[in-house]
């Protein structure tokens, strides 16, 4: 093979790997987080776990990606090690799907039907459809379909290019002698493992082996140990991802290694013993692409079947390899679910971000309600809790904000990108709500320390204000947690009512001050209090408006709110009237 042949082969390999990656990314985006959510929740039954592991891997076209995802689930405590074992087994079966797709390149025959099955016949059509969807369609779903079709076409073209480039090696004696050397089981396993460890994809390395079949020099005796080694080499990705993870995550990575390593040993020992007694006629024949796919599938199904009754033993072996220590019972860190491993699968990472954001929202709401209660029933311990919770919310914002920024730099779908932006905006509002909770607790502390108290009329007005603030807080956060757009639309009318309440309470206080029914000192406290209340309502409005804008693809906040409050907006006016009547202050003459 001359330099141009080598360049053609390497170029074909580059196209092959790029196509595989593009197709996998497109499939992952199209499926969204549905498969991952199922994987996360439906793994209690071993058979379900195996099927789901196979399904997810067949879709995202990478057993390594599935296993890394599982390591992340185990590391964050979402999945137990016993659940992970079945998924890992299934991932090994699912990864064989790629080799079956690639086996289409080896189809022989001159009939019209056989010609249509050849990739050279249909991949140009798929490429045309794919590029049309990518360039012309505005729908993100159609763009993802286009990416899948283009990825598949490039994958097949790369495979054909590699096969054509290596075909001249059929008459190269040096090449044949190298392949003969790999028919030695030990050397073949090592070669397959090293190749797969380097490119970190067993599907890709099996594809390369299938391309080499075009030379006619690859026999099944050579291919078998290489395929066995490829299954071992794919474990490197999971082992690397487990570095720095907790002990259970390390055990999950080792389960993947033991499954393939011990499965390879058992399979090869049995195969070579049987072959020695009853020689297989096909073993010294030239391998083809379909034969490689069959061998790859048979091994992974065989390994799953022999391990299925011994899943507990596999789990125990992992525990023996990574032992617990006496000081390993440290409390679980809730931020473990923001695992960097999930960033490789953005839809999974986004689900974890939503989970943390919900906890942050609940913490901010509880903190504010606790601080509001201090105005009527003060105690120092609750003030401490308010301050502790505010610091906790700050940590939430720091950890979650940093993770979201990392996630935002990934290749996200338009929908996921909008969700990341919404979360970044909302967590800032949650943090500010907790800050106002501290301010309110300081008002309560000042009143308690100085022995101050509001007038009876002011207490009645604040009680009504409390009710309105509690409702807008619950409405905004419940809408956020459930993604309820209709509920979010109730926030802005109530926020306007709260603005009016603040103005009216302040005006009434000025009147009482003039009549000597209230002191200037209490006026400062009241002003601080209702200002903090009104600011909290503003942040609730920000949360709801952000949700609605993301949903409606409208990003001009000022114009949106202006349109919302327009006199011809019947829905807004109707809700505003209902809230105004519900939170109406007592008659002014009676309060003076």
Where do the PLM segments sit?
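Interfacial loop-to-helix junctions that mark the boundaries of transmembrane helices
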Residues: 1-7, 109-121, 175-181, 221, ...
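Helix-loop-helix hairpins and the membrane-proximal interhelical loops
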Residues: 1-46, 145-194, 212-215
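Hydrophobic core segments of alpha-helical transmembrane domains in multi-pass membrane transport
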Residues: 8-22, 53-57, 125-137, 150-162, ...
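Short helix-coil transition sites and intra-membrane helix breaks within transmembrane domains
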Residues: 24-28, 57-65, 166-167, 195-204, ...
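Hydrophobic alpha-helical transmembrane segments of multi-pass integral membrane proteins
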Residues: 42-69, 185-208
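Membrane-embedded alpha-helical segments of transport systems
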Residues: 59-66, 85-102, 119-124, 155, ...
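Membrane-interfacial helix-loop connectors
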Residues: 69-91, 99-121, 159, 196-233, ...
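Cytosolic, long alpha-helical scaffolding segments
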Residues: 79, 105, 218, 244-250, ...
């Amino acid at each position: 093979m001359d330099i141009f042949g080598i360049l053609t082969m390497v170029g074909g390999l580059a196209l092959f790997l790029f196509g595989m990656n593009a197709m996998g990314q497109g499939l992952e985006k199209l499926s969204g987080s549905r498969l991952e959510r199922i994987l996360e929740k439906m793994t209690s039954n071993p058979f379900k776990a195996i099927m789901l592991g196979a399904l997810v891997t067949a879709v995202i076209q990478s057993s390594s990606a599935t296993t890394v995802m599982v390591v992340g689930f185990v590391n964050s405590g979402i999945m137990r090690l016993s659940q992970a074992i079945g998924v890992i087994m299934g991932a090994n079966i699912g990864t064989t799907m790629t080799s079956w797709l690639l086996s289409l390149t080896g189809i022989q025959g001159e009939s019209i039907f056989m010609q249509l099955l050849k990739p050279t016949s249909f991949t140009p059509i798929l490429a045309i459809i794919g590029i049309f969807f990518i360039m012309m369609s505005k729908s993100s779903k159609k763009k993802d379909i286009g990416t899948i079709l283009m990825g598949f076409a490039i994958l097949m073209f790369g495979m054909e290019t590699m096969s054509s480039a290596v075909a001249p090696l059929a008459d190269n004696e040096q090449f044949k002698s190298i392949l003969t050397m790999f028919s030695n089981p030990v050397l073949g396993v090592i070669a397959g493992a090293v190749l797969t460890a380097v490119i970190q994809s067993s599907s890709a390395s099996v594809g390369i082996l299938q391309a080499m079949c075009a030379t006619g020099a690859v026999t099944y005796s050579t291919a078998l140990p290489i395929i066995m080694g490829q299954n071992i080499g794919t474990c490197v990705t999971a082992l690397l991802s487990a570095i720095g993870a907790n002990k259970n995550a390390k055990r999950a990575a080792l389960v993947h290694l033991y499954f393939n390593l011990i499965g390879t040993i058992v399979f090869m020992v049995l195969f070579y013993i049987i072959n020695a007694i009853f020689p297989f006629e096909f073993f010294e024949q030239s391998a083809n692409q379909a034969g490689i796919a069959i061998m790859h599938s048979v091994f992974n199904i065989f390994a799953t079947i022999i391990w299925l009754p011994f899943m507990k033993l596999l789990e125990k072996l992992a525990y023996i390899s990574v032992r617990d220590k006496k000081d390993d019972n440290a409390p679980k860190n809730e931020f473990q679910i923001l695992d960097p491993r999930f960033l490789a699968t953005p839809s999974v990472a986004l689900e974890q971000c939503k989970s943390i954001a919900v906890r942050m929202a609940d913490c901010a709401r509880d903190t504010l309600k606790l601080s509001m209660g201090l105005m009527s029933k003060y105690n120092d311990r609750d003030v401490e809790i308010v301050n502790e919770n505010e610091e906790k919310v700050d940590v939430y914002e720091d950890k979650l904000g940093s993770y979201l920024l990392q996630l935002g730099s990934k290749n996200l779908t338009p929908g996921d990108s909008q969700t990341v932006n919404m979360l970044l905006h909302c967590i800032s509002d949650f943090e500010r709500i907790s800050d106002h909770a501290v301010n309110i607790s300081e008002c309560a502390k000042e009143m308690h320390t100085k022995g101050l108290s509001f007038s009876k009329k002011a207490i009645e007005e604040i009680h009504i204000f409390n009710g309105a603030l509690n409702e807008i807080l619950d409405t905004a956060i419940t809408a956020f947690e459930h993604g309820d757009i209709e509920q979010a639309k109730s926030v802005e009318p109530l926020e306007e009512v709260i603005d009016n309440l603040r103005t009216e309470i302040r005006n009434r206080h000025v009147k009482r001050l003039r009549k000597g029914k209230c002191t200037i000192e209490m006026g400062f406290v009241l002003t601080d209090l209702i200002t903090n209340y009104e600011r909290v309502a503003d942040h609730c409005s920000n949360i709801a408006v952000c949700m609605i804008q993301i949903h409606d693809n409208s990003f001009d906040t000022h114009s949106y709110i202006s349109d919302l409050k327009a006199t011809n907006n019947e829905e807004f006016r109707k809700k505003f009237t209902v809230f105004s009547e519900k939170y109406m202050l007592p008659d002014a003459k009676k309060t003076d």
